[in-house]
Every structure is written in C-alpha cells, then in structure tokens.
Amino acid sequence: MHVKKKLISLMLALGLLGGTQTAFAAEAAPEAEPLPAWSYGMLADGYSLGLFGDEIYTQHSQTVTTEQLDTMTKVVADKLALLEMETRPAADEGLVIDTTRGGVVNALYQEAAAYAFPGIEAGAEEFMTSVGALAGDGSSLRLEEPCTLLEAAAMADSLILNLYDQQNAGSLGLLWKADNGEGNTLYLLGSIHTDVNNTYPFHKQLRDIILNADQVTFELDFNDQAQIAEFAAMQVYSDGTTLADHVSPELYQATVKVAAQLGMDEQAIAQYKAWALATSLQSLATLDETTSSNAMAVDLYVNAKAANAGIPIDAVETYAFQGGIFDNLSPEYQETYLASGLLMAVDVNTVDQETRDALVAVLGEEALEPATQEAIQAQVDQISAMMETWKNRDVAGFEKIYDKEAILESDDELNSKLFIDLDPGMIQYAADYLSQEGSHTGLMVVGAGHMVGDTGIVQGLIDQGYTVEVVPNP
C-alpha cells in the first residue's frame, strides 16, 4: 500500500498511455540546477534503478547524505543479488564508510565484495576503477574530498551496469529487427507499460540499440508539452460537471473512499473522468515490491535514455487520438470500468458495506465471490508472467499468455478498439520508415500487444515483403 499511496497522483495523470503531467500538485518543485553534461548518459539508468529521484536536479552538487548513500547501497545489494553469483566471505575489515569519495567507494565495493566477481580481491580502489565505477581528474582519485550526490549515483550506476554487462545479464526485451534489404533497418521493441519484476537494468545489447538509433519512435511523444496538456485536459471534466454527475451516487462515494485510502481528497477525485480513474487504479494493481519508487515504465525509460543522448524522437499517434479512444467509451462501459478498477484496489474481506453494495450494483454479486478474487489475482500474476517473458525475450511465451486473437474476438468495448484503431497506423508508420531512401537505423517502441498476432506490426511488415526476425539473444 505504501507504493500505491506514493504513486496515485502520478499514475492518475499517466494512466496506461504514459507521459502526461498531473493536473494538480502539492507544491511547486524547487528550481533545478543545471546538470553537468557528463551525467546525461547515466540519468535514465540511475533513475530507473531507484538510485535517486527528482532530488538529483536540485541536490546533485551537494554532498551525498548518509541516508542517500544507504539507499544506493541497498539498491546495489538487491541488484547484485539477482545475478546469483558465488558468495564469498565478508571483506569489510578496515573499510571506512563515510560521505567522502573514498568512503562511498568503500560502501559500494562492500556490496560487490559479497560475491566472487573477477578481480574483487584487488580491493576497493582497484576493483572499482577496473569496472569503470571510479575515475579521477587525471592526477588523483580525490578520495579524501566530499562526494556529491551525483558522483555517488554515477559510481553506483556504473558498478551495477558494468557487473551486469560482465555477466551478460539484464532485461533483453521483446525485440525484432526489420529491414528492407537496401540499408534501412527498424528495430521493433514491444513495450509493457509497467515496472515490475526487476525490469532494470536493461541488457547492454538493448541499451546499445537505443543509443545507436538514428531516431526513436514511440506511440506518443512524451516530450510534447502541448499534447501532454491537451491529454491532461481530456481526463477531467470541462463542462461544469464532476464525476458525481456521471456515475451512480453509490459508486461515486465508493470511489471517494478508496481514493482517500490512497492519499487523495474528494476535490481532486471529482474532477477526473471515470476512464482516467479506472486506468490508473488498474495500473496500480500491477505494481509490486520490485517496483522502483520511481516506477519508470519501459517506454518512458527508453524515451529518457534517447532524449538525454540527443537522439531525435518521433511518435506514431497523438495524445488526442489515443485519448479519444478512452474518452469515447460509452457511459455504461466507463462506469463498469471504474467499478472494476475499484474492485482491484480494495480488500473485499474488509471493505465497508456501502462500498460492497456499490460494486455489486454495477458488477453483480459474483464480483465479491472468491472465484472472482482469484481471477483478479490471476490477472495480476499474468502481468508478472508477461514481464518475465519480456525480460527473457521469450516471444512465444508472451504470445501464449497474451492471447490477442481472443481479445480481438471479445465484445469488450475497449480492448478491441485499442488494436483495431491503432494497429494499422503503426504498421504503416513502420513500412514508411523502411521504404525511405538512403540508409537509416531506427527503433520503434510501442505496446507489445501491437507487435504480435495476425494484425500486428511484425506480421503486417512480413505481409508487405519486409524481413522481420526476433533479434538473437547475446
């Protein structure tokens, strides 16, 4: 519940489409200091790993605090444990841990020294230097100087990435390569719009493909502030009405109660449309204990990585187009959608009677039965299973879990629209990129569901004569 409380206001704005801003905020953010150019390359990785949050923009030149260092060493410890390396006896004798550069080096080295990494016996300075986690100014390592937050974050980030690279580890992603046989290549990365199951770090192969692209294309342009503002406006009522005017009084009160448990007041909730609340509640249900406090979905990470590297960004659709799919859902569907989101957010064994009655009125008595609760948990588990296939580049496994044909054949108003309305335009965009003159290498990042199936991008390009293959695992 702690993670959900922390993220509810953010996710209400992000929803499943991602990249929007919240329509309200508790307070204005402090003015940011310019970051040094050398740090741009590590920001997306450090943020996604949870090494730091937005404080990096205002505190990066300040001496790292003990609490911040503790957070970083915990992240390093958790990530290195996932490599399942052979353990070794503790090697912390004589290591002084403080907030100097040397103290930070020792703290990070101590976490790596729990495992039999090659060269670990050389000691803190030599090992950290050998894996690219420690560098000086050309004359010395400046170990006695205070360590800034940014320096500490860069050390921790480099340590994790280099040790993962050394072990050929990291998330591979559902990745295909399409080419026209005449010099144009388009990598296709199927995204899953969540951050669970230790998504980060990405494997070096995938990070390199991002950084070597001439252009990166997403479903939406996460950097277009005008479009983001337009989408944010679509999520709230602008005709003088509130949520209370569009759903039953009982469902409205149930929504207010659940939102209060997640840290939002009635005034904030009332302005949002039912579909915006529903997508947010269902997204929150997919988060787990592995989700970084920054909860950076795959497409948002790739966007940050590419944008920080100065790579041109493009988009297949507009926020208005995709938002319109949700905005045009029937009132009846939106009410059911919201009730379903609430059902995923509450504990039916402890929820108050009024909320139970409100959910039953919309969803029926079976909504509160054990079988339904088991089905909901199965859906959440399915997200986790899909993420495992994503991390391992198991396309067949993903397609087995994600039955696109069943979705297309269903009478669900939303699911079918998300593919019927979007797949053709995505196929055309990819084909246009591949058919342009010259030699180009691009990366297209859209929902994995759009990649697969008979109507998906991969098959659509094959049908047009392009060569499309799953990228071999490194």
List each language-model region with its residue ranges.
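Sec-dependent N-terminal signal peptides of Gram-positive bacterial secreted proteins and lipoproteins
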Residues: 2-25
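A recurrent domain-boundary module in secreted/ectodomain proteins
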Residues: 149-166, 469-474
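Extracytoplasmic/secreted envelope proteins and their assembly/folding machinery
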Residues: 40-43, 66, 70-74, 101, ...
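Extracytoplasmic Gram-positive cell-surface binding/anchoring modules and repeats
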Residues: 26-77, 86-122, 134-159
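Structured, acidic catalytic/metal-binding patches in enzyme active sites
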Residues: 177-414
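Catalytic cores of RNA-modifying enzymes
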Residues: 171-173
